[in-house]
Amino acid sequence: VAISARRENLLNEISKSHDGIFSYPLDVTDSEKCKSVFNDIKEKFKDIDISVFSTGIHDPKSEKSLNLDKVRQIMEVNFFGTVNSINAVCDYYKNRKSGQISIVSSVAGYRGLPAAGAYCASKSALTSFAESLYFEMKRKDVKVTLISPGFIKTPMTDQNDFPMPMIKSPEFAAEQIYVGLVKKNAFEIHFPKSFTFIMKILQILPNWIYFKILDKGMKKISY
């Protein structure tokens, strides 16, 4: 297994404590670095079956008042960072004519949520991108999977100042993703189901009903 992230110390900690895991430090906003790191991974592993791309930052404080620098940063990391990574591997999988590209989006991409405009926009863009990529890669027998988690307890969600329904642990998320990728054949892996089904219902509601429900439910957020 090859893993990449910006924090080299954490990567090394993981790779040293688990046999068969190799770390490759990477900032996904650097498109050329994405290509060079993937070339290093190819050289090491020779044959790659699946690539999972998960990038995400969020700053709820800045989202309560429009901060253009933060909006650009969130889009640059969450959306363009993922696209940079996918761009680095696409030709490999097309030529291989098999394999799987998995994109971690979020249920926040289903509809706009309070105090999360840039984050929702970045994840909505990823969801649409994954749907479009599905058709392109299917012609080459390459599978594309969209992963849409609900609230997962991480340092990022620790910033939120509102109750997060049905929040789950990273271990739960990892198990759901693993089972979905290995044992199921669906385009989208979404979890926890009890929460994501509610979000999918909200997704198809008329705007006036959706806004009324969200406005009532999010009163605890201060602007």
Name the predicted role of every residue range:
Residues 17-32:
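Rossmann-fold cofactor-recognition segment
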Residues 54-59:
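Conserved NAD(P)H cofactor-binding loop of Rossmann-fold oxidoreductase domains
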Residues 62-73:
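Substrate-binding pocket helix/loop in short-chain dehydrogenase/reductase
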Residues 86, 122:
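Active-site helix of classical SDR
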Residues 106:
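Residue(s) in the substrate-gating loop at a strand-loop-helix junction
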Residues 146, 162-197:
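C-terminal helical subdomain
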